[in-house]
Amino acid sequence: MKFPQFDQEIAISYFSDVKNAGQIRNELLSGNPDYQVAFINANTLLSSKHLLAAVYRAVSDQEAGSMKTKNVHSEVLFCLGGNNNIMDSLRRFGIQDDTTNIVAVKIGGGEYTKLVEGTEEPFTDEQIAKNTDIKLVKKVYKLPGTVSLDDRAQVETAAIGALLLRGFS
């Protein structure tokens, strides 16, 4: 896919039953150039719209020369966060050694699906919803008690608003 305003090709895949999250994480931390991919803990995502808002902001920041991180893939993780703390966003939205559901985002083309030992699933809102941890999302975005965990649309609106407004005062 592409956003109409930008030339970069964007590929997104959903993986379940991932067996090598620890290896992927180690490769990311070591700076292996083959791993220039945003690997996201799928349990922290609410919908495709939620992720695409962060991807759009990351690509927009890249085009404007205003990225806060080293590359556009880490910028996606940073943009998912609702605050200006890069490490906090990487920790909250990135994968851990025991992550079993991963969404991978590759911006700019290139192979990445062979890096993940898991089952590739369709990237759909239904697939995302199967594993979303609403309580975790509410905690990550520090949503007030007035936001109902039962109202997924309300949580999604609040989360997307937080990531879009990050950095504005």
Curated annotation (Swiss-Prot):
Quaternary structure note: Component of the EKC/KEOPS complex composed of at least BUD32, CGI121, GON7, KAE1 and PCC1; the whole complex dimerizes.
State the Gene3D superfamilies in the record. CGI121/TPRKB (3.30.2380.10)
Q: What family does the entry list?
A: Belongs to the CGI121/TPRKB family.
Stored InterPro entries:
CGI121/TPRKB, CGI121/TPRKB_sf
Query: What's in the GO CC field?
Result: chromosome, telomeric region; cytosol; EKC/KEOPS complex; nucleus
Q: Which GO terms describe its biological process?
A: tRNA threonylcarbamoyladenosine modification
User: This chain belongs to which protein, by name?
Assistant: EKC/KEOPS complex subunit CGI121
Gene it is expressed from? CGI121
Q: Where in the cell is it found?
A: Nucleus; Chromosome, Telomere
Q: Which UniProt keywords apply?
A: Activator, Chromosome, Nucleus, Telomere, Transcription, Transcription regulation, tRNA processing
Q: What does this protein do?
A: Component of the EKC/KEOPS complex that is required for the formation of a threonylcarbamoyl group on adenosine at position 37 (t(6)A37) in tRNAs that read codons beginning with adenine. The complex is probably involved in the transfer of the threonylcarbamoyl moiety of threonylcarbamoyl-AMP (TC-AMP) to the N6 group of A37. CGI121 acts as an allosteric effector that regulates the t(6)A activity of the complex. The EKC/KEOPS complex also promotes both telomere uncapping and telomere elongation. The complex is required for efficient recruitment of transcriptional coactivators.
**Looking at the record's lineage, which domain of life comes first?**
Eukaryota
This protein's species is Yarrowia lipolytica (strain CLIB 122 / E 150)
* SUPFAM superfamilies from the UniProt entry: PF0523-like
